[in-house]
Regions:
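N-terminal interaction modules that seed assembly of large macromolecular complexes
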Residues: 11-72
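Structured alpha-helical bundle/scaffold domains in large eukaryotic membrane-trafficking regulators
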Residues: 48, 52, 103, 107-115
């Protein structure tokens, strides 16, 4: 996984890739982040490339210190930092979207309860339209980040041979529609993968 209790820093690790309150705990987010990582990033990247991303997370450049344009950083460090940032952005947004209801409720032996502040402060419930807009925004940001991730890896395939040898890449390479860009060339969809990968309901 590319989030951890060790690097959580009172939610600052998550806040670096999306707008959240710094009081958010790793304990609350660990399962949603792990689920989204396994459900979306692992199938997209393949096991070898996921291993590379996790290694970059654990031992590579610190994105809080290393910006992509930092002088003195090697080209590979800049690429690794960018790759990790895109992966984390996709992972975080998809975790909130995928587990939206579970995150906003408590499940106990007494049943299901709405989350309330532990320190006694009161928070007004969001309106239904705000909740719907938030869900759509999280979904779009997450899937757009996955598109950005694929474009990044296609552009830097020589630097990341783990992705080039993955079954996921081989399947996409032989597909009729390989990417959002292929669809965008024929019919403008504004780069939204949700349009060309959505399943009929």
């Amino acid at each position: 996984m590319i989030f951890s209790a060790k690097k959580w820093n009172n939610g600052k690790e998550l806040k670096a890739v999306m707008k959240v309150n710094t009081a958010i705990s790793f304990d609350m987010m660990e399962a949603p982040l792990r689920n989204a990582f396994r459900q979306y990033l692992v199938p997209l990247l393949g096991d070898a490339m996921v291993g590379e991303v996790v290694e970059i997370y654990e031992f590579g450049p610190n994105p809080d210190v290393l910006e992509q344009n930092t002088e003195g950083a090697t080209e590979r460090e800049k690429l690794d930092s960018r790759l990790l940032e895109i992966c984390k952005r996709a992972n975080a947004n998809l975790a909130f979207w995928n587990d939206f209801d579970e995150i906003s409720m408590r499940i106990t032996d007494a049943g299901f309860q709405r989350q309330k502040s532990d320190n006694g402060e009161s928070f007004q419930q969001v309106y239904k339209y705000q909740e719907d807009n938030l869900r759509a925004s999280l979904r779009n940001k997450g899937f757009n980040a996955l598109d950005e991730l694929l474009e990044f890896l296609y552009a830097h395939i020589a630097e990341y041979p783990e992705f080039a040898s993955s079954q996921a890449y081989q399947d996409r390479k032989s597909a009729i529609v390989r990417s959002t860009a292929d669809v965008n060339d024929v019919c403008f969809i504004n780069g939204l993968s949700l349009i060309h990968i959505s399943e009929p309901t």
